[in-house]
Amino acid sequence: MNVIDQLEREQMRMDIPAFRPGDTIKVHLRIIEGEKERIQVFQGAVLRLRKGGVDSTFTVRKVSDGVGVERVFPMHSPFIERIEVVAQGKVRRSRLYYLRALRGKAARIKTRTAWD
């Protein structure tokens, strides 16, 4: 086993739940401002997953006050307190960039049921 592979394996988090594009998740972030520390929650739909070991990222989109906000999170970041899966979405694409152009009810994602 390579030394680099061993270091990457040590830095990977094992407490991340399984989620896919289309799922609605809550990302609890640890924000450090000066000497204060607080938790900020970012809830939205997963647009994409990029798997690459320690370098894995995922993009979450939410609409805040009528403005679309997208944020890219490193999967194994120490600033992520936890990730909660709120709802599982039923989509047929792995990249949901088409949601950027949709507004209102058209931007909704169907929920996945147990037999889907």
From Swiss-Prot:
Record flagged with keyword Ribosomal protein: yes
InterPro entries in UniProt: Ribosomal_bL19 (IPR001857), Ribosomal_bL19_sf (IPR038657), Translation_prot_SH3-like_sf (IPR008991)
GO biological process terms, semicolon-separated: translation
GO terms, molecular function: structural constituent of ribosome
Domain of life: Bacteria
Keyword annotations: Ribonucleoprotein, Ribosomal protein
Pfam family, one: Ribosomal_L19
GO cellular component terms listed in the entry, alphabetical order: cytosolic large ribosomal subunit
Function text: This protein is located at the 30S-50S ribosomal subunit interface and may play a role in the structure and function of the aminoacyl-tRNA binding site.
Family: Belongs to the bacterial ribosomal protein bL19 family.
Protein name: Large ribosomal subunit protein bL19
Source organism of the structure: Solidesulfovibrio magneticus (strain ATCC 700980 / DSM 13731 / RS-1)
Gene behind this protein: rplS
